[in-house]
Amino acid sequence: MAAQDQGFKSLRQLSASDKEFCFEMISHITSNLDLTETQLSQLKTAYRAIGSYLANQGGKLVECHIYAQGSVGIGTSVKPIDEDSDMDIDLVLHLPSQHYPTTTDEANELLFNLIRVLKDSQRYGDKIENMPKRRCVTLQYGGIEGQGFHMDITPSMPEDMDSPNHKSKVRVADIKDANSPSHPYGYRKWFRSACSKEIRWNRKSNYRSNNDIYAGTVEPLPGQGRKTVLQIVVQLLKRHRDMWKQNKQNVYGDCAPISIIITTLAGLAYEKCSNSNKEYQNPFDLMLDVLEEMPNFISHQYQSNGTVKYTIRNPALPTENFADKWHEKPMLPQAFKAWYTQVTEDLAKLLELDQGLDKTIERSREMFGSQATRGIQAKLADTLTERRAKNRAVVSSIGLGVSNAATATPVPKHNFYGDV
């Protein structure tokens, strides 16, 4: 039996109370990876100010629209392992009246012009980097509450000038290919739609909607809404990937799976679970099904030269293949397989029965880092005390008292966490 199959088997054999404890612990871990309310608010203010400044420069910038893409836009941000490292914030600067470049010279000119405009600003002149990246310019924003940030600003233009809105398909400047098709708004919309899909909970389940996830113990950011199972799973996998990548025993180096692949596979798997009409007893079982289904959305085709072409389609732009580099660099699919096997093995080891809470916390720290597990033991102990006070606690074989009774309380309709 494959290592990951054995891992899934052992995880599925956990008792109902252990599964509740496990997902509650995972929820606490991912909450430590979130941006704070202050950080989110100041970032939103910061990039809106950038948009206002650019719009005031006239010309093609007058009607520009700036918005967050990537993890910040879909509520799956993960703080860096090294707390001294900057966090990437991906922004799209849409230019509705600008034709997309058709040559690499035009792409270079567009990006350097954007740098020049920001250089002329007293506010941004010392923050903008002198050279563009392949598709964006970078603004070193500085720190908020001890966390450093830099903003990658990607200019986009309408693919069809008859549909200039940023909500349509776009082209982004690309100094190697002149332009690249993209649909960042569509991807964000797709992922948010996946998050909001209803799950069928068993009539004996404590859960009645996506929002009923330990509502009494996992605090959402005020005004940001409660995270869904899908967002929690993506954050967990991304942090595990980050830790796995820097492990000295990892022979794959920078070939670790990129975030867009992890996020897309998890989102597609979650949609399949929702559409299956399967009834779930708890979010832990849903998480396991999502993990197990992820590889099924990677297609492969053998080429005449003996190589394999892999495809992971962008749900918002099916012509885009997120695995396009896997064909050229065989280490990439090998790294994905190695990481995927490792994450299932690690989760099984983390949740081994009879190891006690202290050992579980120690293993979670090794797997996700000290930042992610900060305060987790106290949080779980507080939860146990609260449940015992209500005479609803039973003893988990993992070593923490957890409740078989309802632990989640209804919450309002989900307002997307990280909606910036």
Predicted regions and their residues:
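N-terminal regions immediately upstream of nucleotidyltransferase
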Residues: 1-86, 97-110, 398-402, 407, ...
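Conserved catalytic core of two-metal-ion nucleotidyltransferases
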Residues: 53-58, 74, 108-182
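Catalytic residues for metal-mediated phosphoryl-transfer on nucleic acids/nucleotides
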Residues: 64, 69, 73, 143, ...
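Terminal (often C-terminal) interaction modules
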Residues: 1-30, 295-420
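Extracellular structured ligand-interaction cores
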Residues: 86-90, 134-136, 148-152, 234, ...
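Conserved nucleotidyltransferase catalytic core and NTase-mimicking acidic/glycine-rich helix/loop elements
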Residues: 219-351
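Extended, alpha-helix-rich binding/interface surfaces that flank or overlap catalytic cores
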Residues: 150-222, 393, 399, 420
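Short beta-strand-to-loop capping motifs
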Residues: 93-97, 270
